[in-house]
Amino acid sequence: MKVHQIKIDFNVTEQIKRFVYVYILEAESLYLIDSGVYGSETKIMDYLDSIGRNTSDIKGVFLTHAHPDHIGSAAWFREHSGCKIYASEGERLWIEDIDLQFKERPIPNFYNLSGKSSKVDFVVKDGDEIRLEGGAVIKVIRTAGHSCDEVSYLVGDCLFIGDAVPVKGDIPIFIDEQEIRKTMNILETLEGIETYYPAWDRTYDREMMKSRLADAVEIIDMLKNTVLELDDGTDLETLTSQVCDRLNMQMLKTNPLFCRTINCLRGGAIMTKS
């Protein structure tokens, strides 16, 4: 099975530019790992045309989690190709009801990024194996923490990890300290994986992934230790500002997603979908 990586550029605001990677698994049929933001179907379909494939070849979209830059064009592909949508139970509610997601996790430009709600045809869980046309198997591995029930997808010796790993130089976004640490341990101890496919960077071999995981644990520990040192029971907004000043992250002071990270590190309520 051949893997194609497509970079999707988008803007959260006019000033905040981001990107995400969508992956295409190509065999007799095609399968997407995540779907980018709303409107990504145009770039994806242009790419498919360049390799001699078309919409009807897409049989499934496997979503790692429910955030807008991953689910944005899922509804479009389901409608136009008849493909099935796969996601975990914990992420399903926000995929099937983006209004609920906006209510519980508002971000700028939300609806322009997330597009439309999409039905999840198949709910997956840790350990599930889905047999694709042509005989390939996708195995589901729960890698929560960044979101409440994120999953990674293992195909042969390739692991598609979405946003499971915090990245140096980017906004550390996770909602559950225990889960994110558990995920780092799971990814470190998995055997037989040769290539890792993140949603936010080029592919990694095993040694590079080992380094990225060490960086991620360092980020989590640094934030945790800073929170423990500074937290005197003050309100969350003030604590977040103090952490940002201490770590020279002033640009994150008003970022609501980073504020949630600080909240979980001080032992605040875990924000899950209900």
Language-model-derived ranges and their functions:
Residues 39, 137-222:
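Metallo-beta-lactamase
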Residues 44-47, 73, 180-183, 223:
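A general structural detector for well-ordered alpha-helical segments in enzyme core domains, enriched
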